[in-house]
Curated annotation (Swiss-Prot):
Annotated protein name in UniProt: Ubiquitin-ribosomal protein eS31 fusion protein
Annotated zinc fingers (C4-type), start-end: 121-144
SMART domains registered for this protein in UniProt: Ribosomal_S27, UBQ
InterPro entries assigned to the protein according to its UniProt record, in alphabetical order: Ribosomal_eS31, Ribosomal_eS31_euk-type_sf, Ribosomal_zn-bd, Ubiquitin-like_dom, Ubiquitin-like_domsf, Ubiquitin_CS, Ubiquitin_dom, Ubiquitin_ubiquitin-like
Signal peptide: none
Keyword ATP-binding attached: no
The UniProt record lists the keyword Transferase: no
Amino acid sequence: MQIFVKTLTGKTITLEVESSDTIDNVKQKIQDKEGIPPDQQRLIFAGKQLEDGRTLSDYNIQKESTLHLVLRLRGGGKKRKKKVYTTPKKIKHKRKKTKLAVLKYYKVDSDGKIERLRRECPNETCGAGVFMAAMQDRQYCGRCHLTYVFEKSS
C-alpha cells in the first residue's frame, strides 16, 4: 500500500509499505529518500507520536494516509546565570531570650503579697499580659500605641 509523508519543508513524499511494517521500517525508508537519520525523526499521525516498535496497523494507518515528519529536539531550556550580589546580605535580627523574664514585671513583698511593677495596658485590643513600657516622663504600649504622659510638678 502507499502512504504519504509530509516533511518539514512542506514537501510530500510517497512510500510503498505494508500494514505489518513497523515504524522503524518506515523511518528507514524515509532515511533512504531524504537522508534524515531515524533517531532524529518523529512521525505524527492523527495528533499522536508513533512509537518505533509498533506497526502501522496498530495505529490504524491505511492506504493513502498522511504522516507528518518533524525533527526531534534534544535537551532542555537554556542554563541561567547565577545572580551575583554586590552587597552582602543583611543579617537577620535575633531576639535575645532571657530566662524568667516575667520576674521583671512583679515583686513579692515580705508578707507574700505580689505587687505589679509595670502597668498592664487597659485597652481592650491588647488584652491581658501586655505591659506598658515605663519611660522617664510617660508610659507607652508598644502594641496599640497608647501613651500616658506624666506632668512634672514644680
